[in-house]
Structure formats: structure tokens, C-alpha cells
């Protein structure tokens, strides 16, 4: 079984180049292998072919359900939001990025477009505490899935989180020290001023949502 190439230790010539398009049949075979690698590692939610040394426009994701991307293309994008993300190919590294809160994509294996959105539903949080919690958790998962889609498509186009990095400190006024941000560790969500949230986010455990 192939392994994810650690780009801090090994050269991966495919990491920074657009990958070639493949047939649906070949893409499905590659996707099967990628899922096996991802499931074996148990520390990631998405994987692109070039991360294991395969030159093919194929990636897989498993957040809410397994998703296969073969030759994916953007059809439509939503509003940009701040995010904080890492990468299996750059272990221990996480950076602030800007991502779309919704995307519509087209893949080679599907006739219809796919819509992914992490934006709140109009009825989210309107009735009952338990419903609010369910809606909040569902929104966080939908947003994570939407960001992961973009992360993997970046890989297929020769981009990575370092290409998407934005500096989120008071020095460049991306986020003011007294500006409130929402952060999550996957279990709990908090709304804090950036001056209190910054150290939590930089620890890598918490991320901006």
C-alpha cells in the first residue's frame, strides 16, 4: 500500500503541479486505493492522488459520507470566510486560509452538479435548545466538508495550504484583537475575542469556523 508523502522530509514532484485528467474507470480504481490509505491512517478526512505519488485528477473525502472527485471543476462559489486548516502532506503545519462557504462542482462521473454548503440554514437555531445544537453540529460538519472539497481540489491543481495562507493577526488587520470569532475543537464551539482565541487557534486544536 502506498503512503502519504511527507513533503518536509521527501521530495514530491507532483505536489506543486496540476495533475492529468483520467477516465472515470481509472479514477474509480485510484479512488478505491485512496480510501484504503485514508482508512488505514485514521487521521485525515481527505486525500488527493498526488499526495501518494499518483498523477491523476482524483481525490476522496470522508466527512459526512464518502465522496469521490474525478476531474472536478467549480461551477459556482459562495462567499469567502476565514478558516484554519492543516494537511497530511505537511504534518504539524496549520495555517489561516480563506475558503468559500459554499461551492457547486462538476465531476466526470456524475451528470448533475454537486452542491456543498457550510452556510447556516434559514431555520437554524430557531426552535428548541436540542434542535439548535443539532443544527450547529450539522452546520460545522457541512462547513468542514465544503472546505475539504476545496482543499482537495487545490491539490489536484498543484496548490496547497501554503498557497492559500493569509496572516490573521492585528499587524495586517485581517482580524482585530477585539473582533469576535467563532472557534471549534470539533466537540465544543466558542465565540471569543481574537486576543483570547488566537493562542487556542495557533495550538492547532481549535479552528475558526
Q: Can you annotate each of these PLM segments?
A:
Residues 188:
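Extracytoplasmic/periplasm-facing segments of secreted or lipoprotein envelope proteins
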Amino acid at each position: 500500500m502506498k503512503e502519504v508523502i511527507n513533503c518536509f522530509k521527501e521530495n514530491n514532484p507532483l505536489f506543486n503541479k496540476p495533475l492529468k485528467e483520467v477516465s472515470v474507470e481509472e479514477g474509480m480504481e485510484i479512488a478505491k486505493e485512496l480510501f484504503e490509505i485514508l482508512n488505514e491512517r485514521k487521521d485525515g478526512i481527505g486525500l488527493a492522488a498526488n499526495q501518494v505519488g499518483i498523477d491523476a485528477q482524483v481525490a476522496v473525502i470522508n466527512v459526512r459520507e464518502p465522496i469521490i472527485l474525478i476531474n472536478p471543476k467549480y461551477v459556482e462559489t459562495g462567499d469567502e470566510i476565514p478558516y484554519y486548516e492543516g494537511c497530511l502532506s505537511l504534518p504539524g503545519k496549520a495555517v489561516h486560509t480563506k475558503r468559500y462557504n459554499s461551492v457547486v462542482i462538476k465531476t466526470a462521473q456524475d451528470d448533475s452538479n454537486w452542491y456543498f454548503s457550510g452556510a447556516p440554514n434559514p431555520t437554524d437555531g430557531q426552535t428548541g435548545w436540542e434542535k439548535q445544537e443539532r443544527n450547529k453540529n450539522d452546520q460545522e460538519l457541512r462547513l468542514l466538508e465544503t472546505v475539504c472539497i476545496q482543499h482537495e481540489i487545490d491539490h489536484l491543481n498543484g496548490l496547497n495550504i501554503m498557497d492559500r495562507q493569509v496572516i490573521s493577526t492585528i499587524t495586517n488587520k485581517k482580524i482585530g484583537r477585539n473582533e469576535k470569532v467563532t472557534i471549534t475543537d470539533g466537540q465544543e464551539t466558542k465565540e471569543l475575542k481574537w486576543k483570547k482565541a488566537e493562542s487556542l487557534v495557533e495550538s492547532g486544536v481549535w479552528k475558526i469556523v
